[in-house]
């Protein structure tokens, strides 16, 4: 497993070919996923280990992907801290008791995730025999402190994160306490995932691109640095990914992750120049291209591979999650194509 193409590349070593996996590779674009999810809520599937394990394995059984990513959601820890989470059709995740005041921060719990989310480790234990037999590593993941804080304050997804920024500016001490609580819970949660069998982890900072460089450095970087520092001690590669965050990449990369994720807005070679020497990079196809004609998908895949230029350390991925309308046969065809074109 340690010599898998994905793990070698995550460590910056040369692999026999460019490894491929996709964010949201276990998802609604797969008919078998829709069949298994029918009549079940998102949280029900996450909290039922045999369902979560099977969903994680579906794309691995269907396509020659180089890594599995645990079926989970970045918001899973929020209910264990005292926030009421629901997934509402047509809306997405909703927090029914969002954070409005410093007192709301102070009453948030910092639970031991082994006790409050035992289903996650059990899901991993159930799926590891299959992954081990295939030599496929598992990626565990969490949301980053800022992204979870933004959900907790906004109550749902937001375009501009006005409530989050107002709280951050008006209540800096409470904001620091909130970020510290998320740092502790998320570090503990990733520790449990690695102990159960994950051999790499990804930290999703989905909404960090809404921040200026100054605000990232002042209000977000300390807790995120603490999280990455704690997770690095687990001895597995750490991937750090933000959306719309090219302007933040030098600061994000300075936190010491092994791999930096890049979205599709910046050419891969330009993004690679923004990060630390020796860091690997992951990305960065626009996920909508998987719904384009093959000639265009092939053309832009060739462009990305040209930008990578055969350098060790490139993990091929989309620059955001796969969309529900994505044709599964295109995902399979693309995976095969990247493998064929990058044989070394």
From Swiss-Prot:
One of its GO terms (biological process) is protoporphyrinogen IX biosynthetic process. Its EC number is 4.1.1.37. This is Uroporphyrinogen decarboxylase. Keywords: Cytoplasm, Decarboxylase, Lyase, Porphyrin biosynthesis. It is found in: Cytoplasm. NCBIfam families: hemE. Homodimer. The lineage of its organism: Bacteria, Thermotogati, Deinococcota, Deinococci, Deinococcales. Substrate binds at residues 24-28, 73, 151, 206, 320. It comes from the Bacteria. The record marks 73 as: Transition state stabilizer. Catalyzes the decarboxylation of four acetate groups of uroporphyrinogen-III to yield coproporphyrinogen-III. One of its GO terms (molecular function) is uroporphyrinogen decarboxylase activity. Gene3D superfamilies: 3.20.20.210. It comes from Deinococcus radiodurans (strain ATCC 13939 / DSM 20539 / JCM 16871 / CCUG 27074 / LMG 4051 / NBRC 15346 / NCIMB 9279 / VKM B-1422 / R1). It catalyses: uroporphyrinogen III + 4 H(+) = coproporphyrinogen III + 4 CO2. Pathway: Porphyrin-containing compound metabolism; protoporphyrin-IX biosynthesis; coproporphyrinogen-III from 5-aminolevulinate: step 4/4.
